[in-house]
Amino acid sequence: MIREIQIAIYLTIFRLLFNLFRVFPIQKKATFIMSYGENALSIYEEMREKKIDLDVVFLYKPTCKYKLKDYPEVKSYQFETLSIVNMIEAVYHLTTSKYVIIDNYFGFLSAIKFKEGTECIQLWHAAGSIKKFGLLDPNFNKRSKRDQKRFKRVYNNFH
């Protein structure tokens, strides 16, 4: 119960910031949200090689095992920390990006609706594995109705 309250507070703050930043225009920008990094960095390397004209932002969780300082041309921010400043910067970049590229499930997607013109793309982070995920995960039905509803809102954000 306490965890659900914490999640609800976090998502409310996230939604408020996101809606506040909606006044800013969408920019030619790709924001990568990385919990792992492998696939996202491969895509970034390909974009750089093909000279795709987009600003790039990395939002990374502490679980990301790559040294993003090796990419000084990219703005990088730690994501989902207790830092209010990092949260504000992260939400701003998400709100103003033309492309949002994620490598995992992120609950904040249940609280927002991207502006028309923004594409949210989910990368599969476990190439070659065979497992059930998303709504087919056997544990899905064991979750609370509130959790199930939030998961469905997240999955509705993908194109």
What is the meaning of each model-derived region?
Residues M1-I88, Y99:
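N-terminal pre-catalytic "stem/leader" segment of glycosyltransferase-like enzymes
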Residues N19, N39, N86, H93, ...:
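Detector for Asparagine
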Residues F32-I33, Y92-G107:
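Short N-terminal targeting/anchoring amphipathic segment
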Residues R48-K51, Y92-T96, L109-C120:
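Glycosyltransferases and closely related glycan-assembly transferases
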Residues Y60, N104, W124:
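Glycine-rich, histidine-containing beta strand-loop boundary motifs that form or position
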Residues K65-L68, F108-A111, S129-K132:
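Short catalytic/ligand-binding loop motif for oxyanion handling, primarily in non-cytosolic enzymes
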Residues Q78, F114-H159:
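Active-site-proximal region of nucleotide-activated glycan assembly enzymes
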Residues M87-A90, G107-K113, R150-K152:
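Catalytic micro-motifs at enzyme active sites that drive phosphoryl/nucleotidyl and oxygen chemistry
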